[in-house]
């Protein structure tokens, strides 16, 4: 209930929120009834009737003190009450009087007992107990309990940086970040480089500067003691001669104790692998070395099989976050890499670089030496020549010297041939027995040791060898059935999901596999041929 009491006291006015069952007794306690106008009384009684009789949780207490049960507690008149009673009716409401503002706040939170001088401050504070967050961000949907917090959050989306450093003109989105940054200008540069005597305010800046010296030292090989010191500097520790903090050398370098005790282990890490910075983080599984501990940590996921980054759409997991970012573009359809020539977008940068080769001079004109057809790229030309190879009959095997010469693709360098191979091995390598399977411009140099089948790509040979080994690395998450190739798993999962991506343009019927659609389309092609016979009958 709101009560407006006006007077000509020291303050301009006072607005109080009071919970009271009997407003008559409250008016007798706070001020004489003769000093109140009838309109103020009607407002008090009307607002009081709208409140439940026992609603006390989350409401402030009265000025004179009131129990949570709702019954008023009598208090003797004070100087503040006398000042309130002496005010003239109709005075404008304003801030608290000096006697109230200088003292303890009179708006009390019934949940934690904290006091406030303003009703608006109490209302904002009560949101911490109720969990109310009425201010919603229109970009990401995050909600806030206070409007200034929403304004600070929206700067992350807009990129606004309204707080500028007067020393270096660097800008910040929040004032506390600016105040923290300004301390760096008043702080003396106490960290000096022992090689060039350059001073830095932070030890982090000194460590980054010292890495530049390490890269400049051409051909220098650091000893074990220098390697340990460099590792200590990376961990922001100052190291005296000897093992750091009493820890053994192998533990400080992140190595295995068993491997460290082997002969030649110290010599393996005693110096850098190249002219740059030494690599002191070594994988215990394969022996590969890294300059950063984070790189070693990511590399070890290859051996442990850890995939901490999961796709929220399909559940597929990845060992590195950039791989997950690239995968998410398959769901969102984002293509952030556009071609500057034709405007075509690509999800990955490597796909864009491969596409840019088609815009190079002469790349658009790749004629086929057999039929003269122009292909857009050399890869398209090789695929086109395979069609010619399948259409042509197989060349019978003749004398060892009658090897047919393959026509060269324009602009494509010939593959080197080893002079140590025997004629029989060379015939097998170049696919003499399977001339109809290999294109005339691209020999098949990857041969299966089990059945002798040849392939043009190493990946195709790897997939083929799963037939002999029985390996099925792609399991179905629904029924557990395993497959040797991922496309087979994709087709199988359509049986669980009911997806039918191949639609017949004639009748609109859907199919889960493309060959089923092609078989179905024969029905529509054969229907007109049967109609004359039916009419003759």
Curated annotation (Swiss-Prot):
Chain spans, region Disordered: 39-98, 386-437
Covalent link location (Glycyl lysine isopeptide (Lys-Gly) (interchain with G-Cter in SUMO2)): 533
MF (Gene Ontology): DNA-binding transcription factor activity; DNA-binding transcription factor activity, RNA polymerase II-specific; RNA polymerase II cis-regulatory region sequence-specific DNA binding; zinc ion binding
Keyword set, alphabetical order: DNA-binding, Isopeptide bond, Metal-binding, Nucleus, Repeat, Transcription, Transcription regulation, Ubl conjugation, Zinc, Zinc-finger
GO CC terms of this entry: nucleus
Subcellular location: Nucleus
Keyword set includes Hydrolase: no
ZnF (C2H2-type) residues: 107-129, 135-157, 163-185, 191-213, 281-303, 309-331, 337-359, 366-388, 446-468, 474-496, 502-524
Keyword tRNA-binding among record annotations: no
Biased composition (Low complexity): 82-98, 388-401
Gene Ontology biological process terms in this record: regulation of transcription by RNA polymerase II
Pfam families found in the cross-reference section: zf-C2H2 (PF00096)
Sequence similarity: Belongs to the krueppel C2H2-type zinc-finger protein family.
Protein task: May be involved in transcriptional regulation.
Protein name, entry field: Zinc finger protein 775
Natural source organism: Homo sapiens (Human)
Name of encoding gene: ZNF775
């Amino acid at each position: 209930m709101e009560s407006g009491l006006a007077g000509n006291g020291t303050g301009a006015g006072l607005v109080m929120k009071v919970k009271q069952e009997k407003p008559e007794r409250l008016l007798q306690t706070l001020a004489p009834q003769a000093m109140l106008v009838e309109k103020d009384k009607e407002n008090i009684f009307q607002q009081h009737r709208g409140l439940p009789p026992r609603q006390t949780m989350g409401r402030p207490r009265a000025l004179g003190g009131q129990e949570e049960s709702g019954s008023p507690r009598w208090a003797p008149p004070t100087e503040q009450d006398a000042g309130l009673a002496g005010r003239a009716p109709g005075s404008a409401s304003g801030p608290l009087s000096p006697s109230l503002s200088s003292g303890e706040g009179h708006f009390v939170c019934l949940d934690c007992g904290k006091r406030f001088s303003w009703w608006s401050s109490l209302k904002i504070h009560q949101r911490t107990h109720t969990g109310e967050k009425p201010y919603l961000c229109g970009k990401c949907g995050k909600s806030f309990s206070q409007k200034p917090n929403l304004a600070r959050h929206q700067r992350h989306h807009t990129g606004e940086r309204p707080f500028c450093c007067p020393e270096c003109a660097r800008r910040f989105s929040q004032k506390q970040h600016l105040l923290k940054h300004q301390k760096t200008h008043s702080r003396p540069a106490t960290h000096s480089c022992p090689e060039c005597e350059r001073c830095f305010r932070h030890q982090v800046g000194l460590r980054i500067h010292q890495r530049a010296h390490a890269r400049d030292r051409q051909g220098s090989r650091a000893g074990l003691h220098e390697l340990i010191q460099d590792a200590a500097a990376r961990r922001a520790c100052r190291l005296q001669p000897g093992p750091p903090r009493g820890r053994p050398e192998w533990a400080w370098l992140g190595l295995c104790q068993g491997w460290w005790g082997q002969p030649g282990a110290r010599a393996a890490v005693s110096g850098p692998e190249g002219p740059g910075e030494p690599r002191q983080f070594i994988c215990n599984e394969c022996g590969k070395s890294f300059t950063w501990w984070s790189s070693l940590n990511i590399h070890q996921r290859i051996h442990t099989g850890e995939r901490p980054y999961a796709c929220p759409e399909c559940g597929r997991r990845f060992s590195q976050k950039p791989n997950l970012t690239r995968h998410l573009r398959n769901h969102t359809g984002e293509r952030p890499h556009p071609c500057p020539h034709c405007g075509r977008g690509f999800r990955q940068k490597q796909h864009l670089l491969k596409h840019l080769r088609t815009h190079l001079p002469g790349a658009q004109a790749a004629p086929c030496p057999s039929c003269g057809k122009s292909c857009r790229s050399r890869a398209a030309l090789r695929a086109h020549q395979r069609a010619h190879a399948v259409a042509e009959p197989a060349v019978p095997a003749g004398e060892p010297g009658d090897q047919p010469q393959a026509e060269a693709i324009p602009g494509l360098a010939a593959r080197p041939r080893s002079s140590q191979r025997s004629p029989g091995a060379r015939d097998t390598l170049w696919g003499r027995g399977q001339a109809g399977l290999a294109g005339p411009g691209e020999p098949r140099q990857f041969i299966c040791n089990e059945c002798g089948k040849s392939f043009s790509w190493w990946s195709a040979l790897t997939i083929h060898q799963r037939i002999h080994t029985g390996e099925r690395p792609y399991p179905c998450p629904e029924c557990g059935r395993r497959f040797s190739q991922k496309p087979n798993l994709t087709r199988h999962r359509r049986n669980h999901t009911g997806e039918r991506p191949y639609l017949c343009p004639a009748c609109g019927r859907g199919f889960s596999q493309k060959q089923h659609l092609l078989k179905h389309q024969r029905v529509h092609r054969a229907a007109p041929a049967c109609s004359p016979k039916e009419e003759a009958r």
